[in-house]
Curated annotation (Swiss-Prot):
Keywords tagged on the record: 2Fe-2S, Cytoplasm, Iron, Iron-sulfur, Metal-binding, Pyridoxal phosphate, Transferase
NCBIfam families in UniProt: IscS, PRK02948.1, PRK14012.1
Alphabetical GO biological process terms: [2Fe-2S] cluster assembly
Positions that bind pyridoxal 5'-phosphate: A75, T76, N155, Q183, T203, G204, H205, T243
Family statement: Belongs to the class-V pyridoxal-phosphate-dependent aminotransferase family. NifS/IscS subfamily.
Reactions catalysed, as given in the entry: (sulfur carrier)-H + L-cysteine = (sulfur carrier)-SH + L-alanine
Official protein name in the record: Cysteine desulfurase IscS
Length: 404
């Protein structure tokens, strides 16, 4: 077993060796290096064929028509293209958008930008387990609502939203529904031929493909229109210009092909490992599970260890690559906005750790993790005056700290 142990698969994944192998065949002179838009020679045709195969592989995993898959530089761009693209195209119908407070920053900050441009955005607060209350969503819908953006799986706590029902609600009212499926694709079954979802964002690097490549699903029946955000040669049916990076696309396609084949067995294995990890730490005092094991994706476990400062905990766990909050916001010392939106205190949000497991996680690593966490928590609490006061029965919240 090598240290440190990687338990941050929700931030990114290593590229699967089978994916890397395929990608390397699309780079050098003796490989498939052509520009797929070059229609006048064999190099272009071969490149275009490779892109078509990958587009099919992605469409097959999610039950879409390959013509509905638009390649982008990643899920952040897909979220931007979907939300800005739909808002700009349909703004004559209305300027109201609904999303939730626990969305990824790529959705929240895009909505903030649209607010600056005169759109009206409603941010729903989820229930304490992270699930959106569908009655609240329904109550928020208005005649001028044009777009709802609610993710499939939350990147910090792993809870799964009921996108099928939300889709039905939106379709019944003629509202466009966008789903950020970054954390769910390849982990949960997605069938866009059944779901009433109009726009869906994907990425390569959360599912053992390369970074820098993603896709946006844009429904054809009923036809959804979006305004391009990137202009140029009119690639990708005019929705996203730019030369297609064949090696990245082939990598993403292969990753999605593997996911389709291995998803069921892999998720069963990860569920067992995640439950083993939770069973190993849940009997400690003042340990709380964030999210919902029943309504959660099998590879994420988010736990708060009360009376332990999150940053010191991460330092104590330096043999584990884990995060508090998401990678995108973990650089700031603010407590996770997702956990705060669940109604959690700053202290508890600050003491939370996200363990995310993946394809190369072993049982041995999980057992080592349990041992390390138990030892570290015990040691850090021994050093904590707050823990001592708690053990003596002092209500910490009733203390009035003097300001210096």
């Amino acid at each position: 077993m090598k240290l440190p142990i990687y338990l941050d698969y929700s931030a990114t994944t290593p590229v699967d060796p089978r994916v890397a192998e395929k990608m390397m065949q699309c780079l050098t002179l003796d490989g498939n290096f052509g520009n797929p838009a070059s229609r006048s020679h064999r190099f272009g045709w071969h490149a275009e064929e490779a892109v078509d195969i990958a587009r099919n592989q992605i469409a097959e995993l999610v039950g879409a028509d390959p013509r509905e898959i638009v390649f982008t530089s990643g899920a952040t761009e897909s979220d931007n293209l979907a939300i800005k693209g739909a808002a700009n195209f349909y703004q004559k119908k209305g300027k109201h958008i609904i999303t939730s407070k626990t969305e990824h920053k790529a959705v929240l900050d895009t909505c903030r930008q649209l607010e600056r441009e005169g759109f009206d955005v409603t941010y729903l607060a989820p229930k304490s387990n992270g699930i959106i209350d569908l009655k609240e969503l329904e109550a928020a819908m208005r005649d001028d609502t044009i777009l709802v953006s609610i993710m499939h799986v939350n990147n910090e706590i792993g809870v799964v939203q009921d996108i099928a029902t939300i889709g039905e609600m939106c379709r019944a009212r003629g509202i466009i529904y966008h789903v950020d499926a970054t954390q769910s694709v390849g982990k949960l079954p997605i069938d866009l031929s059944q779901l009433k979802v109009d726009l869906m964002s994907f990425t390569g690097h959360k599912i053992y493909g390369p970074k820098g490549i993603g896709a946006l699903y844009v429904r054809r029946k009923p036809r959804i229109r979006i305004e391009a955000q990137m202009h140029g040669g009119g690639h990708e049916r005019g929705m996203r210009s730019g030369t297609l990076p064949v090696h990245q696309i082939v990598g993403m396609g292969e990753a999605y092909r593997i996911a389709k084949e291995e998803m069921e067995t892999e998720m069963a294995r990860l569920r067992t490992l995640r439950n083993r990890l939770w069973d190993g730490v849940k009997d400690m005092e003042e340990v709380y599970l964030n999210g919902d094991l029943e309504q959660g994706v099998p590879n994420i476990l988010n736990v708060s260890f009360n009376y332990v400062e999150g940053e010191s905990l991460i330092m104590a766990l330096k043999d584990l690559a884990v995060s508090s909050g998401s990678a995108c916001t973990s650089a700031s010392l603010e407590p996770s906005y997702v956990l705060r939106a669940l109604g959690m205190t700053d202290e508890l949000a600050h003491s939370s750790i996200r363990f995310s497991l993946g394809r190369f996680t072993t049982e041995e690593e999980i057992d080592y993790t349990i041992k390390l966490v138990r030892n570290s928590i015990g040691r850090l609490r021994d050093l904590s005056p707050l823990w001592e006061m708690f053990k003596q029965g002092v209500d910490i919240n009733s203390i009035e700290w003097s300001h210096h």
